[in-house]
Amino acid sequence: XXPQQLGHVKAAXSDY
């Protein structure tokens, strides 16, 4: 759930 920046990919509102 929360907006997380995974390395170079921004996952907004995603748990991935």
Curated annotation (Swiss-Prot):
<comment type="function">
    <text>Antibacterial activity against Gram-negative bacteria.</text>
</comment>
<protein>
    <recommendedName>
        <fullName>Salmocidin-3</fullName>
    </recommendedName>
</protein>
<dbReference type="GO" id="GO:0042742">
    <property type="term" value="P:defense response to bacterium"/>
</dbReference>
<keyword id="KW-0044">Antibiotic</keyword>
<dbReference type="GO" id="GO:0005576">
    <property type="term" value="C:extracellular region"/>
</dbReference>
<keyword id="KW-0964">Secreted</keyword>
<keyword id="KW-0929">Antimicrobial</keyword>
